[in-house]
A protein has these predicted regions:
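Short, surface-exposed beta-edge/turn micro-motifs
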Residues: 1, 62-63, 72-73, 98-99, ...
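Alpha-helix N-cap/loop-to-helix initiation residues
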Residues: 11-12, 84
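Active-site-proximal specificity loops/subdomain of glycosyltransferases
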Residues: 30-69
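Short, surface-exposed amphipathic charged segments that create phosphate/polyanion-binding patches used
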Residues: 45-53, 115-120, 187-190
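GT-A fold catalytic core of metal-dependent nucleotide-sugar glycosyltransferases
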Residues: 61-110
Length: 226
């Protein structure tokens, strides 16, 4: 199973814990690849100029996922601030080949004006849909509309609103695969498979007491002790 994780040099521990939690719970073999912006630039796959509104180094490189998967089969992209409590392979049960991409369709409106590191918290329709994507890399809309030129030249809103796919080709996934800490509650999903620390995770002092933060900290300590 192909997994791509956004990598940010400022949040290495977040990536490490995300990866460890994936491996802890999976029942299938995972091919996990961090998408590092420097590597993408070195390979001439990414040449966008710096966007001061980008809150992470993978704000746009995430959309290289189909290219990196050779436009074959299904691939998952997720932000590095995900923490897995269950088996990611179960998401494959929701595959619908008529769809170009499948996401959790939250109606998310951030309460905070800034993100965990002080970056401006921009608001736009379909916010956070692109933070976890099950992508049908064989789909015509993906192959035609998520090219290198698209990723490097289209606007951020075009990419993050998934406007490279028609609405009828954007499938829905359960909240369990992208539970937004601070937004969702146990009424929405009593036992999430993946917690997304989108406001800020326990690797930041001010966010150590967030929901499911104790589980993240326990996993991170296990990595340190290995």
């Amino acid at each position: 199973m192909k997994i791509f994780i956004g990598w940010d040099s400022r949040e290495k521990i977040a990536y490490q814990v995300c990866r460890a939690s994936l491996l802890k719970h999976t029942t299938v073999s995972l091919d996990i690849t961090p998408i590092k912006q420097k590597d993408m630039r070195d390979r001439n796959l990414y040449w966008r100029g710096h966007d001061p509104m980008s809150s992470t180094e993978f704000t746009f490189t995430r959309f290289l996922t189909p290219y990196l998967a050779d436009y074959k089969g299904w691939a998952v992209f997720m932000d590095c601030d995900f923490f897995w409590r269950g088996d990611i392979s179960t998401v494959m049960d929701y595959r619908d080949h008529s769809n170009a991409v499948m996401v959790v369709k939250h109606d998310y409106v951030p309460k905070e004006a800034t993100k965990m590191d002080g970056a401006i918290q921009t608001q736009y329709p379909r916010k956070n849909w692109s933070s976890f994507m099950l992508i049908n890399c064989d789909h015509d809309q993906v192959k035609q509309n998520l090219t290198l030129n698209t990723v490097n030249n289209e606007s951020g809103l075009h990419l993050h609103r998934l406007q490279w796919a028609t609405d009828d080709c954007i499938g829905n996934l359960p909240v369990a695969y992208n539970y937004l800490e601070g937004w969702h509650t146990k009424d929405d999903c009593p036992n999430p498979l993946a917690v997304h620390f989108t406001r800020g995770g326990p690797w930041f002092v001010d966010y150590m007491d967030v929901e499911y933060g104790d589980e993240w900290i326990k996993t991170s300590r296990g990595l340190v002790n290995e």
